[in-house]
A protein has these predicted regions:
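A generic fold-level signal
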Residues: 4, 68, 80, 111, ...
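Extracellular glycan-interaction surfaces
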Residues: 119
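Glycine-rich N-terminal loop/short-helix segment of MobA-like nucleotidyltransferase
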Residues: 1-13, 26-28
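A structural signal for short hydrophobic beta-strand segments in well-ordered beta-sheet cores
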Residues: 9, 135-137
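Catalytic-core segments of class I nucleotidyltransferases/pyrophosphorylases
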Residues: 85-86, 93, 98-110, 123-127, ...
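Conserved N-terminal catalytic core of the sugar/cofactor nucleotidyltransferase
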Residues: 15-89, 93, 165
Length: 171
């Protein structure tokens, strides 16, 4: 499926996964979106132009080599003065049901002056029962270890300062 179409442009019913993501972001009141691309990025660029969304969307390419998640995020934030970023995996199946949870996560992040927060779910709620889990919760902190009961579902908020000591590369 994704040899000729980037995963975010796959459709569920008549809407792409990326469009669902952008609609949720818009529902959150966010007016500026940065998108990092690599595989078939020209298709994503054309899709954004064609749809004419009501938010300001800037697209930045990885370049010759894929930067993966960390490098892709760094590629986006290195040239901006913004300090805090809400990051979505655009190949996650987002819908409006997540808006309340994301708003609660934002409120918690800013009221507690955090540097990073991840949106996680109990792995029992996943349709895919093969997940081992990404994290466990201990003393209100996510940790990796045995008995990981929570899965990262593709949304996080972080402060740009987390990337200060990294060079732009694949990570």
């Amino acid at each position: 499926l994704t040899l000729e179409t980037p995963k975010p442009l796959l459709k569920i019913k008549d809407t792409t996964i990326l469009e669902n993501c952008i609609n949720v972001i818009s529902k959150l009141g966010i007016k500026k979106i940065l998108i990092n691309t690599f595989h078939l990025g020209d298709q994503i660029n054309e899709f954004i132009k064609m749809k004419n969304f009501e938010v300001d969307i800037k697209i930045k390419e990885d370049g010759k080599n894929i930067l993966d998640t960390g490098g892709g995020i760094m590629n986006l934030v290195k040239d901006t003065t913004d300090q805090d970023f809400l990051v979505f995996n655009p190949d996650t199946l987002w819908n409006y049901k997540y808006v309340n949870e994301i708003n609660e996560m934002q409120d918690f992040y800013f009221s507690n002056k955090l540097n990073c927060i991840l949106l996680v779910a109990d792995k029992k709620l996943s349709f895919d029962k093969s997940f081992n889990g990404d994290f466990k919760l201990k003393d209100n902190l996510l940790q990796k270890g045995e008995d990981n009961n929570f899965i990262y579902i593709g949304c996080k908020i972080f402060n740009k300062s987390l990337f200060e000591n990294y060079n732009l590369k694949n990570f």
